[in-house]
Amino acid sequence: MSRYRGPRFKKIRRLGALPGLTNKKPRTGSDLRNQSRSGKKSQYRIRLEEKQKLRFHYGLTERQLLKYVRIARKAKGSTGQVLLQLLEMRLDNILFRLGMASTIPAARQLVNHRHILVNGRIVDIPSYRCKPRDIITAKDEQKSRALIQISLDSSPHEELPNHLTLHPFQYKGLVNQIIDSKWVGLKINELLVVEYYSRQT
């Protein structure tokens, strides 16, 4: 299944706020109206919707998300927590959380178009897994910095998660550590996602 490129508001109206996909928010009460129309949800549908939230927020294909679930299952610790850490440490998500891109699709475009350096080298793979002490900077070109400046100027200036540090005037971000689960940028029940995939991994 390919990456979703359809109307974004349609998705947030059904699944709730997905800040990685779009900075728009569903209208107040729309979730309640949707629930009342659809009646009681089955357990399968509840798990499916949590999985869809994760997939659309991080901008993943079905195959990519399944791959991350399989990696998380083999790692030590809670599968759900490891899964969220893997997704949060992707380069496209780190750029988004730093405010250097307005959404994860916008961050992916920056990376694909070779505007981003990691530790002084161009990285053009959005799924690149960032590590503690990684230094993320804009390429030293006017166009690259201008694109990031637009995002920095329009970002809501929310508190940065404690695993990241931003130096906006240098167009630079630092990865201090692996993210703590309480700083994940999405309201999600990751256990339901793991349960959804339990028969496929």
Swiss-Prot record:
Region ranges (Disordered): 17-44
Places the protein is found: Plastid, Chloroplast
Keywords of the record: Chloroplast, Plastid, Ribonucleoprotein, Ribosomal protein, RNA-binding, rRNA-binding
Residue intervals of the S4 RNA-binding domain: 89-149
GO terms for cellular component: chloroplast; small ribosomal subunit
One term of GO molecular function: structural constituent of ribosome
Subunit comment: Part of the 30S ribosomal subunit. Contacts protein S5. The interaction surface between S4 and S5 is involved in control of translational fidelity.
Family membership: Belongs to the universal ribosomal protein uS4 family.
Described function: One of the primary rRNA binding proteins, it binds directly to 16S rRNA where it nucleates assembly of the body of the 30S subunit. With S5 and S12 plays an important role in translational accuracy.
Protein name: Small ribosomal subunit protein uS4c
Organism (species): Atropa belladonna (Belladonna)
Lineage: Eukaryota, Viridiplantae, Streptophyta, Embryophyta, Tracheophyta
